[in-house]
Amino acid sequence: MSQSPKVGFVSLGCPKALVDSEQIITQLRAEGYEISGTYDGADLVVVNTCGFIDEAVQESLDAIGEALTENGKVIVTGCLGAKSSASGSNLIEEVHPKVLAVTGPHAVGEVMQAVHSHLPKPHDPFVDLVPAAGIKLTPRHYAYLKISEGCNHRCTFCIIPSMRGDLVSRPVAEVMLEAENLFKSGVKELLVISQDTSAYGVDVKYRTGFWNGKPIKTRMTDLVAALGELAAQYGAWVRLHYVYPYPSVDEVIPLMADGPFKGHVLPYLDVPFQHAHPEVLKRMKRPANAEKVLERVQKWREICPDLTIRSTFIAGFPGETEEQFETLLDFIREAELDRVGCFAYSPVEGASANELDGALPDDVREERRARFMEVAEEVSAQRIQRKVGKTLKVLIDEVSAEGGIGRTAADAPEIDGVVYVEPATKASKRYKVGDFVSVKITGADGHDLWGEV
């Protein structure tokens, strides 16, 4: 029997790009290709790129160059594949003319066509043995579930719509089938992602789909309720990411707080507010009523006291005054957000914000980012200290002789804090990766927790 052709894979960028990689790898495996963990063991290499900020562009170009040097046969996909150079030609083809093919993001079909052209697929009578949940690059106990592609917003600092297009929602039955297959495969935590989770279904006017004979609207609240019901059957978690602050978010909070989905639809919201001063928000083309946002945050916490809010912000946006920046700091103190990230504004090629007046020097942007993080970390440390002495449910990610590392409902993988768990002293309390365990929290710093089973 001839040996199956082997494809190497390099995946860069955000969780949405990771899901694209998973879909491509799943299709490769379904068609009988093997996935190689090394360049020299592969017949060709696929590189999934990121093109959002300058550092990501350079990282992607470097990865392509390395793959060309080490292997020589490279197909490129992802956001950078849609990016043009200053001359108007494709940036990747201009920098690396020896690549075999270039596609944009969310292009499984195009990638597979390119693979077929340069590495014909094998005949394999056992291709149906690929698991229904697909091939995942995450650990077995958690997975990302992408519910839509693209974005209808035109934030001035962002070029995602130009690379990924307008919003296209996946059919609700398709989403639910993938979720069920993931839970059946042993996934304990499902992380719902998209460019704009709140807008799910807008493009199809919230049309009604059917799952197991039941009608479900293609709408965030209805999908979350259905996922919560499914997660409850498997004793699993559902976590929401990239939730644009639409009014519809208010409808999801009660699902987290009480009823049959409590403990399954996690009391966790990843909401990118970006700023708090109305003038800056207008220049960003973001919702500009900071006072109402603060009221909503307070209302959310009244309904769901355990709610964890993660957000991201931009400091040093063009035209931002010191007074406007101080308004942002005041908002952080008042809103008491649990997890916060901040970027010093960085011009992105193709973004309309580049045309705005009032660009700030690099040192001012970076100084404001540092000041922001100092305040945000102080707020976060105060909130996390309140967990000391409590017993929390923890999902174990790693186990070693020194103990375990896990996460609470307040901690998404990779971006939030962790819980360092002491080794179990009794056989009945031993745990393994993917287990839920009750942990008594004994200590905390500004980011992480320590505890014992």
Curated annotation (Swiss-Prot):
Domain Radical SAM core: 137-382
EC number(s) stated in the UniProt entry for this protein: 2.8.4.4
Domain (MTTase N-terminal): residue spans on this chain: 5-120
Alphabetical list of InterPro entries matching this protein: Elp3/MiaA/NifB-like_rSAM, Methylthiotransferase, Methylthiotransferase_CS, Methylthiotransferase_N, Methylthiotransferase_N_sf, NA-bd_OB-fold, Ribosomal_uS12_MeSTrfase_RimO, rSAM
Domain TRAM: 385-453
Superkingdom of the organism of origin: Bacteria
The UniProt record lists the keyword Membrane: no
SMART domains in UniProt: Elp3
Gene Ontology biological process terms, A to Z: tRNA modification
Annotated positions binding [4Fe-4S] cluster 1: 14, 50, 79
Pfam families hit by this protein: Radical_SAM, TRAM_2, UPF0004
Keyword field: 4Fe-4S, Cytoplasm, Iron, Iron-sulfur, Metal-binding, S-adenosyl-L-methionine, Transferase
NCBIfam families in the cross-refs: 30S ribosomal protein S12 methylthiotransferase RimO, MiaB/RimO family radical SAM methylthiotransferase
The protein, known as: Ribosomal protein uS12 methylthiotransferase RimO
Organism for this UniProt entry: Burkholderia ambifaria (strain ATCC BAA-244 / DSM 16087 / CCUG 44356 / LMG 19182 / AMMD)
Lineage of source species: Bacteria, Pseudomonadati, Pseudomonadota, Betaproteobacteria, Burkholderiales
